[in-house]
Amino acid sequence: MATGIASGCGQLHLRKPVYLRNSYGNKAHCHSNVILNGTQNQIAWSSWVSNVLRVNRSSYPECQVIKTNWKSSRGTIKSCQQRDGSVTRYFDFTVIGSGIAGLRYALEVAKHGTVAVITKAEPHESSTNYAQGGVSAVLCPLDSVESHMQDTIVAGAYLCDKETVRVVCTEGPERIRELIAMGASFDHGEDGNLDLAREGGHSHRRIVHAADMTGREIERALLEAVFKNPNIHVFQHHFAIDLLTTQDGSDIVCHGVDTIHTETKEVIRFISKVTLLASGGVGHIYPSTTNPTVATGDGMAMAHRAQAVISNMEFVQFHPTALADEGLPNIPSARENAFLITEAVRGDGGILYNLDMERFMPMYDERAELAPRDVVARSIDDQLKKRGEKYVLLDISHKPREKVLSHFPNIAAECLRHGLDITQQPIPVVPAAHYMCGGVRAGLEGETNVQGLYVAGEVACTGLHGANRLASNSLLEALVFARRAVQPSIDHVNVSRIDHGASSWWPRPVAPMVLGDTVLNKVICRTREVRKELQSIMWEYVGIVRSNSRLNTAEKRIRELELEWETYLFQHGWEPTMVGVEACEMRNLFCCANLVVSSALSRHESRGLHYTTDFPHVEESERLPTVIFPSQRNNSWSSRQLHAQPIS
């Protein structure tokens, strides 16, 4: 029997270790262990993470301009310029990401210290802002927490952690009330009560929404509160490069993060007592995704390089209904991300047809259009492959025009912009990468195996979603875990101190300006080509339906592509400590793609979002989360922290 050990943790007994291959050769080495087998009692999700891995403790408001020194109600924020001109900023809390999880957490911890919110683009540019459907919560007397729990567990193919599900479904209603108290405005019915929608996989109406722009309204309300808070400082256009960690015996400790300003190219170091990763998902490992352009897996990759435990990366959710541009009367120019057609369209009675206007969902599942997302996405994929077509049709035109326009104004406007009236014509739709159900493994308070590092939102794997996320549970999970991470973070801050000499503990990343514009442009151009190649490999071999032979092909081709890209960089004068936004995004995409493929290869069954023709059935013995343990034997540039020892 093999034994896997997470950094700083006790032993976990496995039936077998699983390997990630070395990116610089054919010889496999133990890069990480992936747990699938063993008894359920040996790896109870909540107790394992919360105990064994417990750490010691609309329009948007204009973003405030961040200067060198600021004042807050708690005194001066320290900002130091080093002799080489580099800048270090000191905070009690650093939050990476400005979506619902990061902002909600920041507003709470700001009552106890200074907070830096680091965001890659503009503050509102997050997956939250693109969320259409809503937030699920038990707010109707006819509904129950038990019913919400059961729907979540069934949708998750019985891989969910029951305690996590109970916590989220129980605490969700209060988190919604807090949002409303903060100024978020949701739709109400004629009776004055919240208008609750129903979506696929839900047995009751429990979706709180703001038309089909729920995320935008939540983001607006949270940003408004954040910009009014003197203890919160938002750093827009700051791209997080790597977490700053040290090894203390068997423990790994996080001290902050290195960033690069995406416009000035200045490298800025943030030192803090607590860091929250709330950086979103990894949709752009695929060519078509509903995620914003910032979703390149930065948080998951940084955490993996920092020796955090990663889990369930094989479960990539493809939303069944993204707008198929080629089916529109007026085909738009290329989009950076696919336009989502919310689950609520099917929840309100939308019907799926093939291009011959034949309804097909009842052939696949008795719940038809209201089946969970994994079922609907696979059904559409099957139709497209059998019929040789590129999209299917989602029809809501049989519903009253006024109802359609009031419930889905954003979708109606987008389609009309390209010549399609959804009140009279069906909508062309196709599956697109949408949500990562895996991520950085977290306990019930958002804690990780890295001291001082907490996670919330899509970057985290809490056990809520299991093998497939239930519609509208993502914003709910983010709210609940952002709030649950607050008290342990405060406790950690209260027993920690900032060492103002810490800035010199790690070598500084450097912008590659010395390469010159000509070489730099070549590197950027090649990186963009490689990015498209990686996305093509992932869609072709690691898509909705998989097989071991195709996954092995993907693993080999990704390994070769990564080696070729890194060799190209270093042959053109790139150094291991150099950083550029596109290069750093590329290393993160490679890191996450490798995690997805290795996790998929280790699961010998079909469950939820992971469907493989080699193991087409659910196996009870495989009903365990996949766990990737940290390893220090990472030889590729993409898999190493920049401040780690140089590549040999």
From Swiss-Prot:
Biological process annotations from GO: alkaloid metabolic process; NAD biosynthetic process; nicotine biosynthetic process
Observed phenotype of the null mutant: Reduced alkaloids and nicotin levels associated with a lower putrescine production. Occasionally, an early senescence and a lower viability of the older leaves is observed.
GO MF, one example: L-aspartate oxidase activity
Keyword vocabulary terms for this entry: Alkaloid metabolism, Chloroplast, FAD, Flavoprotein, Oxidoreductase, Plastid, Pyridine nucleotide biosynthesis, Transit peptide
First-listed, main subcellular location of the protein, grouped into a coarse class: plastid
Pathway(s) served: Alkaloid biosynthesis; nicotine biosynthesis; Cofactor biosynthesis; NAD(+) biosynthesis; iminoaspartate from L-aspartate (oxidase route): step 1/1
Co-factor remark: Binds 1 FAD per subunit.
Cofactor: FAD
Pfam families: FAD_binding_2, Succ_DH_flav_C
EC numbers on record: 1.4.3.16
Site (Important in orienting the L-aspartate substrate): 199
Keyword Chloroplast: yes
Active-site residues (renumbered): 373
Location relative to the cell: Plastid, Chloroplast
Gene Ontology cellular component terms for the protein in this record: chloroplast
InterPro entries the UniProt entry points to: FAD-dep_OxRdtase_2_FAD-bd (IPR003953), FAD/NAD-bd_sf (IPR036188), Fum_R/Succ_DH_flav-like_C_sf (IPR037099), Fum_Rdtase/Succ_DH_flav-like_C (IPR015939), NadB (IPR005288), Succ_DH/fumarate_Rdtase_cat_sf (IPR027477)
Catalysis: reaction(s): L-aspartate + O2 = iminosuccinate + H2O2
Family matches, as NCBIfam families: nadB (TIGR00551)
Entry's family note: Belongs to the FAD-dependent oxidoreductase 2 family. NadB subfamily.
PANTHER family linked to this entry: L-ASPARTATE OXIDASE (PTHR42716), L-ASPARTATE OXIDASE, CHLOROPLASTIC (PTHR42716:SF2)
Protein name, entry field: L-aspartate oxidase 2-b, chloroplastic
Organism listed in the record: Nicotiana tabacum (Common tobacco)
Gene encoding the protein: AO-2B
